[in-house]
Design a protein with these regions (language model features):
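An alpha-helical support segment within catalytic cores of ATP-dependent transferases
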Residues: 5-13, 117-177
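Feature targets compositionally biased, intrinsically disordered low-complexity regions
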Residues: 18, 27-30, 88, 142, ...
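A generic structural signal for ordered alpha-helices
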Residues: 12-13, 20, 36, 48, ...
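ATP-binding pocket architecture of kinase catalytic cores
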Residues: 23-128
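N-terminal charged segments
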Residues: 1-30
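Charged, low-complexity, helix/coiled-coil-prone segments
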Residues: 1-6, 45-59, 169-177
Length: 177
């Protein structure tokens, strides 16, 4: 019997994953629900989110570097659903690599060099400070910031900032020149 989470997904996603085993990833901090299949990953995100930019960037990166391939991207009134291919291997923060920095550092260095080698003249996604601050302002003004997962010294009585509004003001006033 199909579980209720899978049953609730859009048909375009469900047809790829129906009947397949998965685990739920609890590593990320994005607040998304991430289902890990043997050869695919499904990211379910509350809207609004930046998944459209991520999808556009993933499609643009295809063939340029090893990156997940977008299989299906769907949105409804509440969520966005990104089903992508799964890249096999360990993440850089895996215990294996953290205990073996002499293996990790060269891998990270090669990864940075690979990213730097990409010609970005036709890159469809612009992520500059002005755009990111505008998105942050929208999230703050519309009550879309969840501080429950923030570092303890960021907000509140013992924090550097009273609330997200104060942090946003500080970021706007202290932007690099």
């Amino acid at each position: 019997m199909m579980d209720s989470l899978i049953q609730s997904l859009p048909e375009a996603i469900r047809k790829h994953i129906e009947g397949r085993e998965y685990t739920i990833d609890d590593m990320g901090k994005s607040g998304s629900k991430v289902l890990i299949f043997e050869d695919m990953v499904l990211k379910i995100t509350d809207k609004p989110c930046d998944d459209k930019d991520a999808v556009e960037m993933m499609r643009w990166l295809e063939g340029k570097i090893p990156a997940p391939r977008v299989i299906v991207f769907e949105e409804d009134d509440s969520y966005s659903y990104l089903l992508m291919s799964r890249i096999m291997g360990k993440i850089a923060c895996d215990k294996y690599y953290l205990e073996r920095p002499k293996e990790l550092v060269p891998l990270l260095s090669r990864s940075v060099k690979m990213l730097q080698s990409i010609d970005i003249t036709d890159c469809p996604v612009i992520k500059d400070l002005d755009r990111e601050l505008k998105k942050a302002a929208y999230r703050v003004e519309n009550g879309l910031v969840d501080i429950s997962d923030a570092e303890p010294d960021t907000f509140g009585e013992n924090g550097r900032f009273k609330d997200p509004e104060e942090l946003l003001s500080w970021l706007q006033e202290n932007r690099p020149s």
